[in-house]
From Swiss-Prot:
Chief location category: cytoplasm
Record bears the keyword ATP-binding: yes
UniProt protein name: Phosphoribosylformylglycinamidine cyclo-ligase
CDD domains membership: PurM (cd02196)
Lineage: Bacteria, Pseudomonadati, Pseudomonadota, Betaproteobacteria, Neisseriales
InterPro entries: PurM-like_C_dom (IPR010918), PurM-like_C_sf (IPR036676), PurM-like_N (IPR016188), PurM-like_N_sf (IPR036921), PurM_cligase (IPR004733)
UniProt subcellular location: Cytoplasm
Length: 344
């Protein structure tokens, strides 16, 4: 008689999936908000909108971590990529004025390693705590043959809410407005295909002291900074005209996404010092300065645009919240079809 087969024989371990859910429940519980109705494990997650909003607008975003995951696999460093995952989506919806409400994740692998997946999702919960949003659910997909052993992919989904009258669109930006930059925590989650190419070429000692008490490996894998709480405080105290999350495309390509067509962000390259990690990447990769600005955040993780009379107050408030603030330049009138970010 033909041997009876089970789902486990086919490569899917339901018990491992159940164990993962039990492992992550305490981490998810710490992220809960009063708007969340019920806990993990349902077919859907329920969230109500607070009555403090007169005309609530939901703002959604989704993203991944990109090829930074390849370094996580190679270096067996899975504890912070979850923070990256949350940061990429919550920082995106934040720029339109939204307070993140909840987050969901998708974790896909060929063979579920419970300890590894627990590390990843623990990081996701940490990111949600930093952002003040609830981790209300997710999907763990074990798909034999789809991914190499030890590898996985991640996607995240964030939803936030903003009062309709307070949606930030950038339409009120005018020449003379001030462009502020908030310091990044490193490369964040974009440009890693180039980072990996530079590492391959340079062959550095990744565990040698590099920047203070950090190794080069630590500096490269450092998680994306989450700007939610400081910027929500800023928006509550100072009129913000526009914000840009500096992700793929760097400073050059992301800043114009919030500018009116007739405006240019004129940025002074001397207004901040290129952090040591980016200096190393530029030198070891022989990367042109303009290519650096359109690939990496170069030490600026978020751009904030305010009226000139609000610049000092915004800088003081953000500094008090622990942010490193750089006065990058000014908005000016656009000439013809010139690029809307000029860095010189």
């Amino acid at each position: 008689m033909t041997q009876s087969l089970s789902y486990r024989d086919a490569g899917v371990d339901i018990d491992a999936g159940d164990q993962l859910v039990e492992n992550i429940k305490p981490f998810a519980k710490r992220t809960m908000r009063p708007e969340v109705l019920g806990g993990l494990g349902g077919f859907g997650a329920l969230v109500e909108i607070s009555k403090k909003y007169r005309e609530p607008v939901l703002v959604s975003g989704t993203d991944g971590v990109g090829t930074k995951l390849k370094l996580a696999f190679d270096w067996n460093r899975h504890d912070t990529v979850g923070i990256d995952l949350v940061a990429m989506s919550v920082n995106d919806i934040l720029v339109q004025g939204a307070e993140p409400l909840f987050f969901l994740d998708y974790f896909a692998c060929g063979k579920l390693d419970v300890a590894q997946a627990t590390d990843v999702i623990k990081g996701i919960a940490e990111g949600c705590e930093q952002a003040g949003c609830a981790l209300i659910g997710g999907e763990t997909a074990e798909m034999p043959g789809m991914y190499p052993v030890g590898e996985y992919d991640l996607a995240g989904f964030a939803v936030g809410v903003v009062e309709k009258s307070q949606v930030i669109t950038g339409r009120d930006i005018r020449p003379g407005d001030v462009v502020l930059g908030l310091g990044s925590n490193g490369v964040h989650s974009n440009g890693f295909s180039l980072v990996r190419k530079i590492i391959e070429r340079a062959g550095p000692d990744l565990d040698a002291p590099f920047d203070g008490d950090r190794t080069l490996r630590d500096a490269i894998i450092a998680p994306t900074r989450i700007y939610v709480k400081p910027l929500l405080k800023l928006m509550a105290g100072v009129p913000v005209k526009g914000m840009a999350h500096i992700t793929g495309g760097g400073i050059t390509e992301n800043t114009p996404r919030v500018l009116p067509d007739n405006c240019v962000a004129q940025i002074d390259a001397a207004s901040w010092t290129l952090p040591k990690l980016f200096q190393w990447l530029q030198q070891e990769g022989n990367v042109d300065a303009q290519e650096m600005y359109r690939t990496f955040n170069c030490g600026i993780g978020m751009v904030v645009i305010v009226a000139p009379e609000q610049a000092d107050a915004a800088t003081a408030l953000l500094t008090a919240e622990g942010e490193t603030v750089h006065r990058l330049g000014l908005v000016r009138a656009r000439q013809g079809d010139e690029h809307q970010t000029q860095i010189a």
